From Swiss-Prot:
Protein's organism: Trichormus variabilis (strain ATCC 29413 / PCC 7937)
Protein name, UniProt field: Dephospho-CoA kinase
Pathway: Cofactor biosynthesis; coenzyme A biosynthesis; CoA from (R)-pantothenate: step 5/5
Reaction(s) catalysed by this chain's protein: 3'-dephospho-CoA + ATP = ADP + CoA + H(+)
Gene Ontology terms: cellular component: cytoplasm
Taxonomy, superkingdom: Bacteria
Keyword Magnesium among UniProt keywords: no
Record gene name: coaE
GO annotation (BP), single: coenzyme A biosynthetic process
Length: 196
């Protein structure tokens, strides 16, 4: 039997973490998360963090020398060229971590949580693409509440990714998170039990 590698993606604040947590807790699937790998990439003393400080100055660092994420976010979500520069450093690191995780896993089903799965051409790492969607107004509201952002800041982050409609068009499975949690989890169960 070939290994199923689910690429779990969706827009920012659509419910990817909810789905991933459910797949881990209810179905006991191994979850590998791009956001965790990306945080590792810029950890204290890493060459990528040094490059970021070299480009933006020491003001991009907190007093303990770690990355000031909100400050970096202000830069990269307002300037596409800066975002692309940062992604060119972080994404190869993240891809390598995924390749290592896949190679080392013996599980018949793996879940790779990759918010920018489609945008950064990592679809070749997975055997199926699951996209979590919700309404645009829900996405905006959730993001503003979760990250304590203004409307403009939240919209800039949403605009930095492909639209939910574009992602859904490429998906093997679309999980609609615009109603209840129960409905979302039922969709996950159905998708998991259906071999593509």
């Amino acid at each position: 039997m070939t290994q199923r590698i689910i690429g779990l993606t969706g827009g920012i604040a659509t419910g990817k973490t909810t789905v991933a947590n459910y797949l881990a807790s209810a179905h006991h699937l191994p979850i590998f998360d791009a956001d965790i790998y990306a945080r590792d990439a810029v950890s204290l003393g890493s060459p990528i963090l040094d490059a970021i400080a070299g480009r933006y100055g020491k003001e991009i660092l907190l007093p303990d020398g770690s990355l000031n994420r909100p400050k970096l976010g202000e830069i990269i979500f307002q300037n596409q060229d800066e975002r692309h520069w940062l992604e060119s450093l972080i994404h190869p690191y993240v891809r390598d971590r995924f390749l290592k995780a896949i190679a080392e896993s013996t599980s018949p089903i793996l879940v790779l949580v990759i918010p920018l799965l489609i945008e950064v051409q990592m679809t070749n790492l997975v055997t199926e693409i699951w996209v979590v969607i919700c309404s645009e107004s829900q996405q905006l509201q959730r993001l503003m509440e979760r990250n304590h952002l203004t409307l403009e800041q939240a919209q800039a982050r949403i605009n930095s990714q492909l639209s939910l409609k574009e992602k859904a068009a490429i998906a093997d499975v679309v999980l609609d998170n615009s109603s209840s949690l129960e409905s979302l989890l039922k969709q996950v169960d159905i998708a998991l039990n259906f071999e593509l």
